[in-house]
Amino acid sequence: MADSPYPTRNYFPGQFVVSAGSILFRRAPESGKLQICVLYHTIKDEWLLPKGRKDCGESIETTAVRETYEETGYKCKLLPCNMSTRAPAHGVHTKDMIREAEQITEPIAITVRDQGLDGVKIISWYISELDGDGQKVEGTQMDTESFASQFINAEEAIRTLTFKGDQDIAAKALEIVRHTGTI
């Protein structure tokens, strides 16, 4: 049996966790400026993006929307955007190559976090927007979560995030949203 010519690592049940989150956008009611919703972890003193583990039987897109709502308190939906992707159009066979796609809700980033002996955490990141009346709902977090959510003007929100990886993901989301121009 031959080995793959590409560096390959397999993870089996118990060696990985699948997670998803989103960068939640809105237009500020007063100024119309783009804002991003960030989380302040009140115990760890960290500014983060909303994300969490996928439930059994749940799609990764549903996870992103659910976790964003649970952690921020804002109902949201995935925002169709124009972006580069290697995913083919539905039902169309094409060569594996980068292409520009319009109005898609694919992940804008994948984070693979090495967790040492616990394996890896794989996080799919999406772009979302407010759904419904845009009012915050209290009491959506799990008992073990201690987040305060806040919409901040997009550029400032990116600088506010504690970790560079989160900053890079939020910056890419902002670039895609501005390129699409739909919010």
Question: Language-model segments: which ranges?
Answer:
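Acidic, metal-coordinating catalytic segment for phosphate/diphosphate chemistry
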Residues: 1-30
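Short, acidic/hydrophobic/Gly-rich beta-strand patch recurrent on exposed beta strands
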Residues: 37-41
